């Protein structure tokens, strides 16, 4: 594999994602299925055509970025298996921000696998003080409840997950702190 070949595959995958029929938000999950794929090295895409979900194999467990929409849990589990990974190995989950379409499978992973949940400090505060901003009530058929965050991330934090070190930044915009990450 070369960077050029990998980038070509990435562009093809983006085309497939953009052409996929999305269905209606928060349901019709079967219309948003995207075949999971390896992005590069130990980084995988297991999300759907609406919400990105990524997995990093850290060598000491899986790190998952976001948890999809309400109703996406079965698809995420299947996609993880399809990549040759085990969902029970998801040790950590980082939420990009505190909206319901990014934490649909959190409660399942916490209950089943004791996955530790990480989120930016301002969104953790939002969960506590203004939970309606998570938009669960707007989801119609979503039965998910808010959950406890295990680790509140601050600006500039550097955390290690297995053999993967990540630098975090809090960027206001879509919410008070959309959480871009830099894998180092």
Where are these regions (language model features)?
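Structural motif
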Residues: 61-63, 92, 164
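Short Gly/Pro-enriched turn/cap motifs at secondary-structure boundaries
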Residues: 34-35, 45-46, 141-144, 148-150, ...
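Conserved beta-strand hairpin/beta-sheet module of binuclear metal-dependent hydrolase folds
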Residues: 29-87, 180-183
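Active-site HxH/HxHxD metal-binding segment of metal-dependent hydrolases
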Residues: 43, 71-74, 81-160
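Core dinuclear metal-dependent hydrolase active-site scaffold
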Residues: 36-38, 55-57, 155-184
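N-terminal pre-domain segments of enzymes
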Residues: 1-33
């Amino acid at each position: 594999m070369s960077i050029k070949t990998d980038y070509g595959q990435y562009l093809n995958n983006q085309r497939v994602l953009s052409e996929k029929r999305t269905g209606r938000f928060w349901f019709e999950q079967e219309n948003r299925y995207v075949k999971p794929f390896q992005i590069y090295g130990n980084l995988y895409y297991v999300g759907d055509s609406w919400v990105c979900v990524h997995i990093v194999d850290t060598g000491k467990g899986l790190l998952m970025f976001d948890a999809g929409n309400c109703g996406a849990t079965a698809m995420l589990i299947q996609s993880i298996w399809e990549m040759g990974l085990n969902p029970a190995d998801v040790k950590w989950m980082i939420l990009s921000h505190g909206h319901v379409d990014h934490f649909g499978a959190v409660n399942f992973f916490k209950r089943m696998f004791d996955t530790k949940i990480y989120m930016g400090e301002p969104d953790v505060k939002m969960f506590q003080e203004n939970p309606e901003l998570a938009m669960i009530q707007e989801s119609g058929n979503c039965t998910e409840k808010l959950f406890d965050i295990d680790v509140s991330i601050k600006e500039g934090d550097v955390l290690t997950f297995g053999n993967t070190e990540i630098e975090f930044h809090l960027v206001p915009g879509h919410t008070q702190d959309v959480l871009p990450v830099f894998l180092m």
